[in-house]
Amino acid sequence: IIKEIYEGEKPAAKITKKDGSLKQKLPDKDFSKIPFSKNDKLKLQYFTNGATAKDISQELKNTQFGEKVIIAQFFLADRGIINDIRKAAKRGVKFEIILNNSNAGLPNKAAAGELMKYARKHNYDINVKFYNKGEEMYHVKMLSILKSDYLITYGGSTNFTRRNMRNFNLENELKIMSAYDQKISKDILDYYD
């Protein structure tokens, strides 16, 4: 994963100078001495920019009847993700969605209204809650899919908006696939509770 992060950040590093070039080439790093994990109950993947949207979309498309998806987001407005949620709910996937309720989170109200109206009309299981702590913002960017024998969780800097998911912003996201007996799975599920 360290190599993936290093390689993924090289393009961003190249554009950090005023003229878009670096005076010297970025160094190649030797990652061969970093041991691979022997834990087959825990896997990590690293995504940047639009690759995050593609992978999340594919995982939502792979959800099945009775599975549950928990979304905790600062912004939820990306049409592709909203459509994936609607299609998954139609297949019998349950959704728990927690959104930012501050003034900064205005797009969330429209997305939440659309999803709740859709759920009521078709009797689908989409539950939307707003995090409300006065002026405090809910700045989380997570999505978890509770499969029968493992958990998939995305966490990083990606808001679920067109700008963040369609290559207009530089974003980083980690995907964790973990068996339920792993500490990270318990920690993630405890966070949502």
Locate the predicted segments by residue.
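Short, contiguous strand/loop micro-motifs
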Residues: 43, 71-72
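Active-site cores of enzymes that catalyze phosphoryl transfer or operate on phosphate-rich substrates
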Residues: 2-55
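PLD/PLD-like phosphodiesterase catalytic module centered on the HKD motif
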Residues: 1, 54, 63-68, 75-193
